[in-house]
């Protein structure tokens, strides 16, 4: 979550955790859409992409946690989306971030 992203997103929660699961970032877009974002990091030489680590079982846990978040915050009527942020370290010491919007659905 960088300062550039703060122009687009407003952070609602970070590492939101319940017994059923955890959501790395919960953000709100200017249009009101809630974005539940799973952040995954892999080394450049990994045989799998970061997004591939978000298995169907992990997706179910995120979905259930998101449902409970919406209930607890009285926001069940809000539009929402589930994104994955793929983070890969570069040789320069910087990071490459690729956002997959709508990576999975409820």
Predicted regions and their residues:
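Single conserved hydrophobic/aromatic residue that forms the stacking wall/gate
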Residues: 1-5, 9
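Residue-level signal for inorganic ion chemistry
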Residues: 4, 62, 82
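A short linear hydrophobic-aromatic micro-motif
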Residues: 10-14
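Short acidic/glycine-enriched loop/turn segments that link adjacent beta-strands
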Residues: 19-21, 93
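Protein kinase-like catalytic core scaffold
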Residues: 21, 33-35, 83, 98
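Conserved catalytic cores of phosphodiester-cleaving nucleases, focusing on short active-site segments
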Residues: 23-46, 54, 62
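Mid-chain, well-packed structural core segment of small domains
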Residues: 46-75
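Domain-level recognition of nuclease-like catalytic cores that cleave nucleotide substrates
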Residues: 72-106
């Amino acid at each position: 979550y960088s300062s550039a992203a703060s122009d687009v997103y407003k952070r609602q929660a970070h590492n939101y955790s319940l017994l059923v699961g955890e959501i790395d970032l919960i953000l709100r877009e200017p249009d009101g859409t809630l974005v539940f974002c799973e952040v995954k990091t892999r080394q450049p030489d990994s045989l799998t992409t970061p997004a591939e680590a978000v298995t169907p079982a992990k997706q179910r846990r995120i979905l259930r946690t998101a449902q409970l978040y919406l209930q607890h915050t009285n926001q069940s009527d809000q539009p929402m989306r589930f994104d994955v942020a793929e983070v890969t370290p570069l040789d320069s010491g910087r990071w490459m971030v690729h956002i997959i919007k709508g990576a999975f659905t409820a």
